[in-house]
Amino acid sequence: MAEEHGGLDWLRGRSVLVAGAGVSGRATIEPLRDLGALVTVTDANVDALAECARLGAATVPIDDLLAERDRVAEFALVVTSPGFRPDAPLLSLAAGDGVPIWGDIEFSWHVDRAGLYGPPRRWLVVTGTNGKTTTTSMLQSILEAAELPSLACGNIGIPVLDALRQTEPRAEALAVELSSFQLHWAPSVRPTAGAILNIAEDHLDWHGGMQPYIDAKARALTGEVAVLGLDDEVASSLFSSSPAVRTVGFRLGVPAPGELGVEDGYLVDRAFADGERLAPAEGITPPGPAGLMDALAAAALARAIGVPPDAVAAGLAAHVVGPHRAALVAEVGGVTFVDDSKATNPHAARPSILAHERVVWIAGGLLKGARVDDLVREVASRLAGAVLLGRDAMQIAESLARHAPEVPVVTVETGDDAGVSAVPQTATHRVVLPADTDSDAVMGVVVREAAALATAGDSVVLAPAAASLDMFASYGHRGDSFTDAVGRLDASDISRTLR
């Protein structure tokens, strides 16, 4: 089969190492085998390796592979999952031995260009610090309304390789959500259109700094049409240096020529048309400025491949917000509880908090090198209280002490976290739980403490500004845990006097 696909025929009979036995790693196995490659998968998780073995791959625990350093040089290619940092020992060893390293998205691109599963698709790439999933799902809804065979894939839906292999029905366009991790390992990708929604501090521990993070995001702009959020300082700064054939901006205000924007209550296109109305701004979900920005980006990508205005309107009208994205959970005792667990960095938490007049903020987790001072300064006037949990809770507490000292703060701590001695003076109350308290029980305490700080008319908002993996399996697990805990409240839990 590989002789028919000249771009990858060099892999026939060659040994390829897949780094990571998760979803993206498993999706790599079958295409590599279709190309005639000899596939070995490595991971620390023996159960995941067993699943890969059932798919026909050889497997080796990563510690065993690292112990046999010379063995890595025997591979013709390493295809890495996005979870591996550039300085991971395995990848450093491969690079030192001169072994090419591709991410799963890079491999997907080459597979598609080589025609392994039919003529190449049109890739519509979405990236940004926040709003990627919402924008991609909006885009997919628009493509469906246009009756264009398409699939949402990448960080949303299914791996890109699985989308390429799906032939019944065959997707002609792919709505591809990509993270900075995936783009870092995908230097060859040239999308039909690619969008950067916004860029703020996130994943700096993985990238090693802000500029490498920006550089990774900018790889979405290397195709035919680049789409940039002009209301975002960092994203808009990339406009003049965009290597795309055509660069289009979008903004919340009235659009200039070459832009999409909002005018007289409508999303308006002055990039691919002369001021054509695309859809009413009212009714976009999720509501608010962030939702409108996502809708404009999705519309721009769709318009870049000729989707008509009526399909944009129909797709946005049909769009349903995914879970854990500013979702209303319940109202208890006059207090509204909102799950925005998807707000995994300070930039994402900001609009979630500012959407409400008075907020008891639930925050904490893994900050991933991001700073919260700017966020706290901006939202301080809205805060009726804060309840903090997770590994980096004290960093948020310290920021509250500096910029919102009048805001009552509760810290819910377990294990080693309870031994932190430098508790900021704003901490009105500390709750110290046994080290073996499970995450759902911790969230139950957090929600009760938040209810205690709230009064009728307030909103308790889970907008953690941090990743979840220090305590929860995912942001979805964290949001579900919050929802379950809210379900156990009654009106008597609201506005208790702090102990």
Swiss-Prot record:
Which cysteine pairs are covalently linked by disulfides here? none
Q: Which GO cellular component terms are attached? A: cytoplasm
What InterPro entries does the database record attribute to this sequence?
A: AlaDH/PNT_NAD(H)-bd, Mur-like_cat_sf, Mur_ligase_C_dom_sf, Mur_ligase_cen, MurD
Pfam families associated with the record? AlaDh_PNT_C, Mur_ligase_M
Q: In which pathway does it act?
A: Cell wall biogenesis; peptidoglycan biosynthesis
Give the record's GO biological process terms: cell division; cell wall organization; peptidoglycan biosynthetic process; regulation of cell shape
Family stated for the protein in its record: Belongs to the MurCDEF family.
- Per its UniProt record, what PANTHER family does this chain match? UDP-N-ACETYLMURAMOYLALANINE--D-GLUTAMATE LIGASE
What is this protein for, i.e. what is its function? Cell wall formation. Catalyzes the addition of glutamate to the nucleotide precursor UDP-N-acetylmuramoyl-L-alanine (UMA).
Protein's name according to its UniProt entry: UDP-N-acetylmuramoylalanine--D-glutamate ligase
The species this protein was found in = Rhodococcus jostii (strain RHA1)
